Amino acid sequence: MATEKVFPMTLEGKAKLENELQELKTVKRKEVVERIKIARSFGDLSENSEYDSAKDEQAFVEGRITTIENMIRNAQIIDAAEAHNGLVTLGNTVTFIELPDGEEETYTIVGSAEADPFEGKISNDSPIAKGLLGHKEGEEVTIQTPAGDMNVKIEKITAS
């Protein structure tokens, strides 16, 4: 039997997934069923693009529900404050300066289930996070990214 994949995440990330799951089950699922019912009323389903679209959306919603349920069931809650030992760990917020241009960037390192680059949350599986994990404040690190090496100096590590 295959081992279930573990999804490291913060309590905040788990709560966000639980809210999304609730929304999908109580609102989105009903909306899609209603769209299917309306599309069926148009008659011939063989050339009914509204029906096809609604069925595609239903498949997406049901797939997302299954995915989220699996992530929640296999969640490994990370307490960043507890894990913070002076080194960059999952759940920490890290501020670093790109060398030599001095551009400052700040990211929170989270599990892949809650990564959202638009909110400054990057997956622990991303090249930047992998390059930062295990290092300490003041350290200069070379991070290997698809675009090439990135040299940074870690300025600040905080528990999120």
Swiss-Prot record:
Residues 10-37 form a coiled coil. GO terms for molecular function: DNA binding; RNA polymerase binding. InterPro entries: GreA/GreB_C_sf, TF_GreA/GreB_CS, Tscrpt_elong_fac_GreA, Tscrpt_elong_fac_GreA/B, Tscrpt_elong_fac_GreA/B_C, Tscrpt_elong_fac_GreA/B_fam, Tscrpt_elong_fac_GreA/B_N, Tscrpt_elong_fac_GreA/B_N_sf. It comes from the Bacteria. SUPFAM superfamilies: FKBP-like, GreA transcript cleavage protein, N-terminal domain. Keywords: Coiled coil, DNA-binding, Transcription, Transcription regulation. Pfam families: GreA_GreB, GreA_GreB_N. One of its GO terms (biological process) is DNA-templated transcription elongation. Necessary for efficient RNA polymerase transcription elongation past template-encoded arresting sites. The arresting sites in DNA have the property of trapping a certain fraction of elongating RNA polymerases that pass through, resulting in locked ternary complexes. Cleavage of the nascent transcript by cleavage factors such as GreA or GreB allows the resumption of elongation from the new 3'terminus. GreA releases sequences of 2 to 3 nucleotides. PANTHER family: TRANSCRIPTION ELONGATION FACTOR GREA (PTHR30437:SF4). Belongs to the GreA/GreB family. This is Transcription elongation factor GreA. It comes from Listeria welshimeri serovar 6b (strain ATCC 35897 / DSM 20650 / CCUG 15529 / CIP 8149 / NCTC 11857 / SLCC 5334 / V8). The gene is greA.
